[in-house]
Amino acid sequence: MKTVYEPPHKNVIYGGGGLIGQMRPLSYMTQILKRKGYNQYGWGLGDHSYICLNEQLQYIPNTPIQYPACIRDFDLLGIRDDYKELRSVVKNVSWVPCASCMHKAFDVQYNIETEVVFFSHSTLPLNIVHGMPQETWNYPHLMNDESDFNKVIRHLASGEVIVTNSYHGAYWGTLLGRKVIAFPWCSKFWGFRHKPVLCKPQEWLQQIKTPTTYPEAKEESREANINFYYKIIERIGNDKKL
């Protein structure tokens, strides 16, 4: 039997992304560490339960999510999915979206340079999708494997409308105050508090006039992260300020 890693400190923080869902090892780890007396906190975790395996379709309808029992193993769980029913049942859960909202790049004022920009998941490139409108290739494109964060943000901000199959592309575009159209190839897309227009890739041009903006999104996201930070600091007895 493999030995499970035991952190050297009693407070463990799990950060980021779709760690809750199929084929995720999170529940195994949280249960063991809970039995060993660790305090566990989840920051910006989220659903990743259902996936569309058809790379041509890249669309999954809104599906009821069943969260695993391991979410009760956390002393505090900040989850990026905005499901009020979950928070009403599991009291240790609060809405905490990705902490990348704190980055100073979102405080810069960017000029809109083009009507549309595309931001694609590197494992789901749009050039493999049949039936995409010809107009798709008339606009700037960037992949989510770009390592320069500021370049990514400048690219997203340069468009009036962002078309993407990247979860974070949709999230960051919303924080920038842009209109967003996203292709929900995974159930995680349906958990956004500030929802983009969700459609099949072939339908993006039909939806071009549909998106709205959420001017409150950046401040709501930052406030949620700051409040969660102080909750954790209070729990672990560290009074260090931001």
Regions found by a protein language model. Name each.
Residues M1-L242:
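Active-site anion-handling motifs in enzyme catalytic cores
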